């Protein structure tokens, strides 16, 4: 699975702040289908570090409750691509963002045999943004996605979107 479309000229400092996971999609149904599925994570905040890395604060359902997690995504030579060692994934790719309203990103595991890909549409405010969702769906067209979830504003406000 190769994600080719990444954001050109990403300014990582501008993605700082609060975000909400409005929609998610994955290459394999089992990555997202259950509340506690491996890549069913809910982004809360992105914090660029002075070194150009990215701290991702998120929530994930574990052992019957909503747990807080922090992932450090290390910068690479490509501004929109980061290395991670978490959630069984090894890369975070920023596909597109306007910094003010939406951000589209994917998490990828390029290692055989369990190649996987999960992408999310993040929004700044807990509202449904149809324009952002359209961009998300357009970006997904080129990718082998088999499950897609979207959340309503009430879910966006809740812990782990419950």
UniProtKB/Swiss-Prot annotation:
UniProt keyword Transport, yes or no: yes
Disulphide bridges, residue numbers: 66-160, 106-119, 106-121
Keyword Ribonucleoprotein among UniProt keywords: no
Domain of life: Eukaryota
Single GO MF descriptor: retinol binding
Keyword field: Disulfide bond, Milk protein, Retinol-binding, Secreted, Transport
Location, primary (coarse class): secreted
Gene Ontology CC terms, in alphabetical order: extracellular region
Post-translational modification: Alternate disulfide bonds occur in equal amounts.
Subcellular location: Secreted
Subunit structure as annotated in this protein's UniProt entry: Under physiological conditions beta-lactoglobulin exists as an equilibrium mixture of monomeric and dimeric forms.
PANTHER family: GLYCODELIN (PTHR11430:SF117), LIPOCALIN (PTHR11430)
Purpose of the protein: Lactoglobulin is the primary component of whey, it binds retinol and is probably involved in the transport of that molecule.
Family under the similarity heading: Belongs to the calycin superfamily. Lipocalin family.
UniProt name for this protein: Beta-lactoglobulin
Organism encoding this protein: Ovis aries musimon
Gene name for this UniProt entry: LGB
């Amino acid at each position: 699975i190769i994600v080719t479309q990444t954001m050109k000229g990403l300014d990582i400092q501008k993605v700082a702040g609060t975000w909400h996971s409005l929609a998610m999609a994955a290459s394999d149904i089992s990555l997202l289908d259950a509340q506690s599925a491996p890549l069913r994570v809910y982004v809360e905040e992105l914090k660029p570090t002075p070194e150009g890395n990215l701290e991702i604060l998120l929530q994930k359902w574990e052992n019957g409750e909503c747990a807080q997690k922090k992932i450090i995504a290390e910068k690479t030579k490509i501004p929109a691509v980061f290395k991670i060692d978490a959630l069984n994934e090894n890369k975070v790719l920023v596909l597109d963002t306007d910094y003010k309203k939406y951000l589209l990103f994917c998490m990828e595991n390029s290692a055989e045999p369990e190649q996987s890909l999960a992408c999310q549409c993040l929004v700044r405010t807990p509202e449904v943004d149809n324009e952002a969702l359209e961009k998300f769906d357009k970006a997904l067209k080129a990718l082998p996605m088999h499950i897609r979830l979207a959340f309503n504003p009430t879910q966006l406000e809740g812990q782990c979107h419950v």
